[in-house]
Design a protein with these regions (language model features):
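Short hinge/gating elements
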Residues: 3-6, 59-64, 120, 162-164, ...
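Glycine-rich phosphate-binding P-loop
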Residues: 4-21
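ATP-dependent small-molecule kinase phosphotransfer cores
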Residues: 35-86, 126
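Divalent-cation
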Residues: 91
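Conserved phosphate-donor/acceptor-positioning beta-strand/loop module used by diverse small-molecule
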Residues: 100-123, 130-136
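Small-molecule kinase domains that catalyze NTP-dependent phosphoryl transfer to phosphate-bearing small molecules
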Residues: 128-172, 202, 208-213
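N-terminal presequence-like segments and adjacent domain-start helices
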Residues: 181-204
Length: 214
C-alpha cells in the first residue's frame, strides 16, 4: 500500500503534481483533514489551526495556542493515515514524521521566487507584485519555522527529501511520472520490517497523544 510524504512551496504547482500522483496511483490525498482532526482533539476552531499553520495568527492566538499539543496530535493523525496506506499526505511535517519509514518516499516541490510571484499574481488576478511576494514570504517563514521548531531541521535542506522537483524546468506531467516511478521502484516497496516500524511509530504517537489528551 503506497504512502507518499509530500511538501511544497507556495505557488509551485505542487498541488497539481500531488493530484496527478494520486490519480495515477489511486491514492487518497490528505491535507486539511489533518488540521480538522487536530482542532477536534484540542477543542479549538479549525480556523485557528489553519491560521497558525499559515503564519497568520495574531499575537494572542499564538500565545494561547499549545504548539506541543498541535505537534503531538498531528503526528498521531499522520501516522494513523500512513498505517492505513494508499495515501499521499501533503504538508503537516509528514516528510519528517514518516522519513524513517523506508517504504515512504519524501517529495518536495519548489521553484524560483520570481516565478512563484508571477504564478501567485496570476492566481490572485492581481498586478500587485508586492502583495504576492509578501504572501509567499509569510508562507515560507511559517513553514520554515514549524520545521525548525518541531524537528530541528532547515525546511529547504535537500538531504531531507528523496526527490526535489523544480517546476521551473520540469513540467507537472513529468513531475508526476517521476514521483510515480519512485513510489513503484524497488527501493520504496513495503516490507515486513518497514510495516512493523511504521506500526510501532503509530503506537508510540497514539500513546503520547492519549497522555496529552488526559
Amino acid at each position: 500500500m503506497a504512502v507518499i510524504a509530500f511538501t511544497q512551496e507556495m505557488a509551485t504547482l505542487g498541488s497539481d503534481v500531488a493530484q496527478g500522483v494520486c490519480e495515477a496511483l489511486g491514492l487518497e490525498m490528505v491535507r486539511h483533514e489533518v488540521g480538522d482532526v487536530v482542532a477536534g482533539r484540542m477543542h479549538v476552531k479549525k480556523s485557528l489551526i489553519r491560521r497558525l499553520r499559515e503564519g497568520k495568527a495574531g499575537p494572542f492566538e499564538k500565545w494561547t495556542a499549545d504548539e506541543k499539543s498541535i505537534s503531538i496530535f498531528t503526528a498521531e493523525e499522520v501516522l494513523e493515515r500512513a498505517v492505513k496506506g494508499n495515501v499521499l499526505v501533503r504538508g503537516w511535517g509528514a516528510t519528517m514524521i514518516l522519513r524513517s519509514v523506508s517504504h515512504v518516499p519524501c517529495v518536495r516541490v519548489c521553484a524560483p521566487m520570481d516565478l512563484r510571484v508571477t504564478r501567485l499574481m496570476k492566481r490572485l488576478e492581481t498586478d500587485d507584485e508586492k502583495l504576492a511576494r509578501h504572501e509567499i514570504d509569510v508562507d515560507d517563514h511559517a513553514r520554515a519555522t514549524r520545521m525548525s521548531e518541531h524537528f530541528g531541521v532547515h525546511w529547504g535542506d535537500p538531504t531531507l527529501y528523496d526527490l526535489t522537483l523544480n517546476t521551473e524546468r520540469i513540467p507537472v506531467a513529468t513531475c508526476v511520472d517521476m514521483v510515480v516511478g519512485l513510489a513503484k521502484s524497488a527501493a520504496f516497496q513495503e516490507t515486513d520490517a518497514s510495516r512493523r516500524h511504521l506500526a510501532d511509530l503509530a503506537l508510540r504517537a497514539h500513546a503520547r497523544a492519549a497522555l496529552k489528551a488526559n
